[in-house]
Structure formats: structure tokens, C-alpha cells
Amino acid sequence: MILNGEEQNAIKYENEMNRDLINNIKYNFNDWDEYLKYGGFPILARKINFRRLSTNIVDMIEKVVNTDMVAIKNFTFENQTNSNRILRYLALQNAGDLSQNILAKYLKTSQANVKNILDILEKTHLIFSIEAYGTSSKRMKKTKKYYFATSSIRNALSENSGNTINDIKQYEGILLENHVASILFNFTQRGNDCFTLYYDANKKRNVDFILQQDFKNPVPIEVGRGRKDKKQITHAINSYGADYGIIISDTTTNIEKHNNIIYVPPKTFSFL
């Protein structure tokens, strides 16, 4: 569906999935919301204390920084501290609000050192980055967007650092964007016919992601908690010559296709 715009097979799969969940008497319909905040780590699956779950995730992150990253040549104790501060900084910002210059001033270090730390953090698979959609020169000029490997990592660090967002829907929307980014990025890393994930760098009516296969028309993807109108996705379809676009939100309770826009509920997208 994502790759070809054909929704029928996905609808069939969605119906089977919903039927299986309804017939599972042990299934808790809050599970998906809990997964968005605390999932992604099978080793922690049986823990039911959410505060303990977040603490365990933070402990794993610190182990990666303080043990695995230390094994890298010339990685100093100061940069261990900087790495932890960068991760917490990222957890409290929108994905596109990272300026290496501002971050360097915040850490009182050089931009080159910030870039080096971010590169190493990517190698640990705690975070990943995507570039702006466009020409090679545009991608070089625009800053990268950074996301966490799972939305639960972002949530754990945010809770641990003191989340400053009071609007729960806004916060869940940020987690959902990270979750979708993670799924799409992992898809592109499996050697699936040269797919690349980008973000939309347009300043007006930009969508969240653009997925492209080689030289084929791109697929714009918009993500949001709650209901989303079609203005942004329609603008992206027209701007980039896309055949169709995808909105991942609570606008519909099931997969629906209206003209050249496919609506997908967040839970369904997670299972596809």
C-alpha cells in the first residue's frame, strides 16, 4: 500500500488483525498507547510498572554511552557527558529544531565535536537522521532531522529530564511522528529496492516525510495524533508530482482511500 498506493490487500490484512485482537480475550485495547511510550524492547515486555520501564530504558541508554561508546578511540569522559546531554536535549525538542551551532554553544564545545558525537550516536543505533528532500546541494545546505530508534527511548528520556510539553495530544503526536519515522527508516535499511526516507523542507504546508524509490514519483506522508485535514498532503502531492499521499492519523478508524489520499490509523500502520 505504501509503495504502490493499492489499499485493498492492506484493508484485508487490517480486518484480519482487528478480528484476531477482538477474539483475544487477554488483549488490552490500551496496549498500543502503552507501546508507543514504553515498547520496543522485548527484554522489558513483562514489566508492568511504567516508571520502572522508563528507568530501565534510561539505564540501557547510559550503558551504551558509558560502556560501548567508551570503547571508541579518543572518546573522552567529557564527551560521555556531552553525549548524555545531547540525547536529553534531543528528547525535549521537535525533530527539526536541532542546530549544531546552538548545541555547540549549549555544550561549550565545537560544532565539529557535536557532529562527531552525533555520528557516533547514530552508529550505536540510539538515534538516526534523515535529510531534506531535494537536490544534492539542497540536502547539503539543510540540517538533518534526528529521531530516536524507538519512541519509547524519547519518552523515557523526556520523562527522566522533565517533559516541558503540557498538551498530551501534542506530546503523543511527537511520539507518533518518531514511531512512524522509525518504522519507515528501518524499512529503508533492509535493502528494499533502494528506498530513501526524507523530510519535507518546504516552509509552508510541509508534510512530515517523503519516501522515494530510485527515480519513481515520491510518496508524501503526513503524521498526526487526532484528526488531520488534507491541505498539507494535497499540497505535497501537487508540488512533487506524487501519484498519491498517505495520512497516518485518527481521522478514520480504518484504512480508507479518497481519491489519491490514503488514510491509515496509527495502530494499523504499526502492524503493516
List the predicted regions and their residue ranges.
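A cross-kingdom feature that marks ATP-driven nucleic-acid transaction machinery
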Residues: 126, 130-272
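Interdomain hinge/linker elements that couple catalytic modules in large macromolecular machines
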Residues: 2-156, 162, 168-175, 182
